[in-house]
A protein has these predicted regions:
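Membrane-water interface segments at the C-terminal ends of transmembrane alpha-helices
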Residues: 25-33, 164-194, 222-224, 228
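Residue-level signal for discrete positions within transmembrane alpha-helices
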Residues: 14, 123, 127, 163-166, ...
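A short amphipathic helical element positioned immediately N-terminal to and/or at the very start
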Residues: 3-10, 89-101, 259, 263, ...
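Hydrophobic alpha-helical transmembrane segments of membrane transport/permease proteins
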Residues: 18-86, 190-209
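Alpha-helical transmembrane segments of integral membrane proteins
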Residues: 3-4, 124-125, 129, 133-157, ...
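An internal, D/E-rich "acidic patch" concept
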Residues: 76-143
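Short hydrophobic, aromatic-rich alpha-helical segments embedded in or entering the lipid bilayer
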Residues: 63-98, 296-308
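N-terminal Sec/SRP start-transfer signal
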Residues: 1-15, 253-254
């Protein structure tokens, strides 16, 4: 019961964070006039469809314009555009929460739909696929290497990987992406420079999957090289620090095998901060993936954010993406809280 109560409290806290961010976002939209702009665009879309239907029945252009103008005024009243923006706060919160933000100005889905909700939901799985794959790879590489280096402090491999970790942390991901494209796509020509599929994309499930995997190799390698260094360094440092604590010395004095000491007394204690860095690193990588996806022409949320910002900004798309990124962060924090309760029983009391 105590565990369930703590989970409920954590979930409520994360929910309040999400609602607070939503409220602040909607207040900013209203104060800057963007909420009015979004609603007027929705009215404009509805009137456009109405005009297309009524043009077949009302032949007199003047009469058609009078009817359209009356309907436009009715729709503006319906959406509350005749009232101050702060009276529409609850409605706008629901709209952002459900991504009911109308149509994008120039952006579309692959099927040609301009609906913002459909555009974002089409791009979301692509971003999750790319960054989650890279995340799993650098976890499988970084944690074992970090643990290994903590037992070989000062050796050649330790010094070499420490230098690599510093370089990996310092090099911008977008610069590394351009460098990898120059080597593997332009010079060696063994990997595609970008995109998710060949042009034209192959037909069939397995052929399409293999083509997607082929196009994923270079961006995943780039993300792994950019992120695995800090994972190795943090794991090594946390493991090494924990190994010097008194309870580890006592466990060794009792004659426990080194493997048992490492598993029960070192990694178990070092796991919570390591997991924290990994989960928050994933959310930070996704949120900072705008330039990475743009360089590799990967049709994810980062590339969508870039397309919405350049040229004539598409405010509604930017708002929807901001909410999705916030939602991802809140979900990651909740998962982190759950893992903390599992990995560190002391947090439960």
């Amino acid at each position: 019961m105590a565990l369930l109560r703590l989970l409920a409290i954590r979930a409520l806290t994360m929910g309040l964070v999400l609602v607070t961010v939503l409220f602040l976002l909607v207040v900013i939209l209203g104060a800057t006039g963007y909420s009015d702009l979004i609603l007027r665009n929705i009215v404009r879309e509805e009137i456009r469809f109405i005009r297309q239907g009524m043009a077949e029945t009302i032949r007199d252009p003047a009469e058609l314009e009078r009817v359209i103008e009356r309907l436009r005024q009715e729709r503006e009243i319906f959406y509350g555009l005749d009232k101050p923006w702060y009276t529409r706060l609850p409605e706008m919160i629901v709209r952002v929460l459900t991504l009911d933000l109308g149509e994008a100005r120039t952006l579309q889905t692959t099927r040609g739909s301009p609906r913002i909700s459909e555009i974002i939901l089409e791009r979301l799985p692509n971003t999750i696929l790319l960054f989650t794959t890279a995340w799993l790879v650098y976890i499988l590489i970084g944690i074992p290497l970090g643990v290994y280096l903590s037992t070989r402090v000062g050796g050649r491999i330790d010094r070499a990987l420490s230098v690599f970790s510093s370089v990996s942390y310092a090099v911008p991901t977008w610069w590394l992406a351009l460098f990898m494209i120059m080597i593997f796509a332009i010079s060696l020509r063994i990997l595609p420079s970008g995109g998710m599929y060949s042009s034209p994309p192959p037909e069939g499930g397995m052929a399409r999957f293999l083509d997607l995997a082929y196009h994923t190799i270079l961006p995943v390698i780039t993300l792994v090289l950019a992120a695995v260094g800090p994972v190795i360094y943090n794991t090594r440092t946390l493991t090494l620090t924990t190994a010097q604590e008194d309870h580890v010395t006592y466990a060794r004095a009792k004659g426990l095998a080194e493997r048992a000491v490492m598993g029960r007394h070192i990694l178990r204690v070092a796991a919570p901060p390591i997991v924290t860095g990994l989960l928050l690193g994933l959310t930070g990588t996704i949120a900072g993936g705008i330039l990475t996806e743009t360089v590799f022409n990967w049709r994810g949320m980062g590339r969508l954010y870039w397309d919405a910002l350049r040229g004539t900004p598409d405010e509604a798309v930017i708002i929807g993406l901001t909410f999705i990124y916030t939602l991802i962060y809140v979900l990651a924090r909740f998962i982190l809280e759950v893992l903390y309760l599992v990995l560190d029983p002391r947090v439960r009391y």
